Amino acid sequence: MKFYSTVAVLCIAGSNLFAQDVYQLFKAEGFTQENLFTNNIEGPCFDRYGNLYVVNYQKDGTIGYVKPNGDVSLFLTLPEGSTANSIQFNSKREMLLADFTGHNILKVNMKSRKVSVFSHDAFNQPNDFCINSKDQLFVSDPNWKDNTGKLWRVDKRGKAKLLDGAMGTTNGIELSPDEKILYVNESVQRKVWAFDVDDRGNVSNKRLFTEFADYGLDGMKCDRDGNLYIARYDKGVIAVFSPDGKLIREIALNGKKCSNLVFGGLNGKLVFVTLQDKKGMERFRNDIPGKNW
């Protein structure tokens, strides 16, 4: 999903959100107020028009719309029994949600706001996902009780295929800018794995990308150069790794329980982070734009 001229117009209009040059490089600051979301705040995602959506606003089972000045309003309440943990948009501009309590991938019509089940398979707890240019989803599916997890691919028709059924607690997941490498982390095991991805979305050559001795791992995103940004849960930093697995820097946040992140702003150089201890969001200016810019 690339961002086009329409987004640029909207970005300029929302100066509080997009005037990124006023922010000190790598210096985190508050974006939304605290305690607007639940402690399950997660899954920040921009649509192609520059609108920001985040899960679990005010109560679990909701989607919040975050305005350019950091104010938040209710966009959608999900059907009873559903709680989203991640958001993506497909090429049809439909919102897709990882529903970890309903064990589904949900689809939202953005005009009618009608919610339907897009995929329902043997999911334990779909947690996070990323999407490629063919509208294929790659989904992490952890079992926190057993410290195990699975990796799925869901095609554009909603058909799921198990790619790896013998992983640790799968959580954060991201594709490289060229969509040839898939990164999947395991929160409890504190490992990040890399897979090669072929043109059909099959994975191979699983290898250890990096691992940590402490704290947790959560959401991940790539910048345009292929560097990987990892939310270090409980440590309160975003760890940035080069494509060859070398630590470039750690960006300190004010909150500790960082759950996910997304690139945004006029040039894609603002990074917005969800924090579960703050029940809100922070942001910082980056030197490289996100992979969609």
Role assignments for model-derived ranges:
Residues V197-N260:
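Glycine/small-residue-rich hydrophobic helix-like segments
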Residues N35-N51, P79-D99, N104, D121-K150, ...:
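Beta-rich, blade/repeat-based domains predominating
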Residues V66-D71, N109-R113, V154-G158, D196-G201, ...:
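Short loop/turn segments that connect beta-strands within beta-propeller blades
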Residues Q20-T38, G70, K206-R207:
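A short helix->beta-strand "capping" segment at the edge of beta-propeller domains
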